[in-house]
């Protein structure tokens, strides 16, 4: 399926502007035109932060920004889907054009700026799937013009508490001015304190404890990673997602669009994000869940993330270039890898290559 998409489907979609093509793909999922049969393998199931995932492969936030097609994404084979980023009030994001394909690099640069329809629209959609099976997480953010950005994250926790299976606190988008400053130790302490307090208050009212993950940037120094790891441990955070898009343009082949402002995702992000993942694993130890994101476009790259220290992995840009058959292809490859490695579960392969990845040098 992914091979057919690369020769025919992608060619057709790429005749459209990137944002139009994205809209068409959402429509295709809504109408049921896009379907894929995917394998189920008990050896791929993994328990993370109290949740049992049927497999470790998830759809990253940014694709289904407004919670329109989470169940359709699960039907493609994803073990979980993350909607958002959602802000309390609707916002249009940055001016177009704001998504740029780098085809030779199998990459994308975006400067969308948290464009979304806001909490209310997503709440109505997610309410319609209440009670359905499948793990759907909610990625929460802050409005660009918010006077108290942390209050926006707290509002997201409270609004979606009964509907989200987990939350991701996104403070690492490079496209909202000043947002990444929340990764600094003092700001992060206040953010996590208030967010986790809201989570605990909501949980006490309904006896459900929703995990909260923190999504970080790949452009952090070792000292910044130290601070985040220490704060995550002190606050008893449920997990860390490594990583968001990068500001680095290292190693790009495609001169066209490479100088555009925004975050780079796709194949060129794989090395950097995997090194940062492994370094974070060394800092947080074996018990804290880590979710690896960045450059996953095959079973090999998904497995590399797991061996570098990821409990779960997510992709997005790989789907743009490989098509809706990619999740099934990755899951089949992971099942084969489990047999080849002589283990009974994908979880047994975690951390096999952490030291080697953490020791790699990053090029700015």
From Swiss-Prot:
Biological process annotations from GO: 'de novo' pyrimidine nucleobase biosynthetic process; 'de novo' UMP biosynthetic process
EC supergroup of this enzyme: oxidoreductase
Claim: Oxidoreductase is one of the keywords in the record: yes
Signal sequence residues: none
Matches recorded under InterPro entries: Aldolase_TIM, DHO_dehydrogenase, Dihydroorotate_DH_2, Dihydroorotate_DH_cat, Dihydroorotate_DH_CS
Topology within the bilayer: Peripheral membrane protein
Known EC number: 1.3.5.2
PANTHER family reported in the protein's UniProt record: DIHYDROOROTATE DEHYDROGENASE (QUINONE), MITOCHONDRIAL, DIHYDROOROTATE DEHYDROGENASE (QUINONE), MITOCHONDRIAL-RELATED
Quaternary structure annotation from Swiss-Prot or TrEMBL: Monomer.
Function: Catalyzes the conversion of dihydroorotate to orotate with quinone as electron acceptor.
Protein known as: Dihydroorotate dehydrogenase (quinone)
Organism placement in taxonomy: Bacteria, Pseudomonadati, Pseudomonadota, Alphaproteobacteria, Hyphomicrobiales
